[in-house]
Amino acid sequence: MTGNTAPSQADARRTVISVDAMGGDAGPAVVVAGIAKSASKNPDIGFLLHGPAEELEPLVARRKTLKGRVEIRDARDVVTMEDKPSQVMRNGKGTSMWSALESVRSGEADGVVSCGNTGALMALSMLRLRKLPGVNRPAIAILWPSRNPQGFNVMLDVGADVRADAEDLLQYALMGTSYIRNSMDLPCPRVGLLNVGTEEHKGRAELKEAYALISQNAEKANFEFVGFVEGSDIPGDIADVIVTDGFTGNVAIKTGEGTASLLRSAIREAFEYSILSRLAALLAYTSLSRLAKRIDPRRVNGGVFLGLNGTVVKSHGGADATGVSAAVKLAFLLAEQGFAEKLAARVASAVELAQDDATSADADAPGDSETGSTN
């Protein structure tokens, strides 16, 4: 254990975020720059930084804003993007990712941020933090720019598990509505189930079953179910929460990121074409800046792992300092709001409702004494 004064010692009021400094595409320097950016904006945040101490100490020492705000936890091993989750679960105890999660498990930190291997992070999170009672499959939720008044939709799952049956999709709806209530203060969010069309007869069998389950639970869980939605509705204003399986969601998010990158490049090329177009770009600078900010994926960098006993935020592996800072901000806000505890209560309530429904159904079913048979 090395570093400056521990965040908890420096100021007991600070919310402590545990950060895996390793595993990102750009290395620990970008992660340290990102937490320094967060520290300069937020005096109420402290950090536990996990990774090889000899690499991290000089990086932290160069950042004046981190003085007294960071404690370095020496972790010699690194989870790479090539490592299989099963291998990490067996042999990952000495890694920075394991160490970062352990700080949340022990109560030293209020949330964790990692840029590392998504599959390994989810596997270790389930191993060290455990799933909430009643949750079958955790999900990764992201904020997606949209035309809604709040400016974003929540979409899940975007890669935690490529499979999802009807019960899983119902749980995603419940967890997604809890997330958006806390992050955007929407008392009765609208939920859409992603499909190949909006008609009820379209889609796979599990989607049709999920449609019925979500419809049945909407009123009890205090959300509005708008039915099936299509890919074109993801950035629209029809729904606030988009529910899908991890395979479809991951393809959608990668497609969206690629399209945003193409749009930025096309606009830049168009305005650099001639002297007149450059003059037009100068005149439209304010509007173009707003557009660039609107579609900048770094602003919403960070997928939240829902369904765990703790707050885990997965930053994009290629995130720069701005992206890392955005992920830290998200972890801080969720920790400040006690989101993990609220989600646990919501899932427990949903499980109780399901059990009550099952009990009622059993009570209503005719027993042997009502069959009218005699021996």
Curated annotation (Swiss-Prot):
A GO term, aspect molecular function: phosphate:acyl-[acyl carrier protein] acyltransferase activity
Pathway noted in the entry: Lipid metabolism; phospholipid metabolism
Compositional bias per record (Low complexity), positions renumbered to this chain: 356-368
InterPro entries: FA_synthesis (IPR003664), Phospholipid_synth_PlsX-like (IPR012281)
Reaction equations catalysed: a fatty acyl-[ACP] + phosphate = an acyl phosphate + holo-[ACP]
E.C. code: 2.3.1.274
Chief site of localization: cytoplasm
Membership in a protein family: Belongs to the PlsX family.
Quaternary context: Homodimer. Probably interacts with PlsY.
Protein name: Phosphate acyltransferase
Gene: plsX
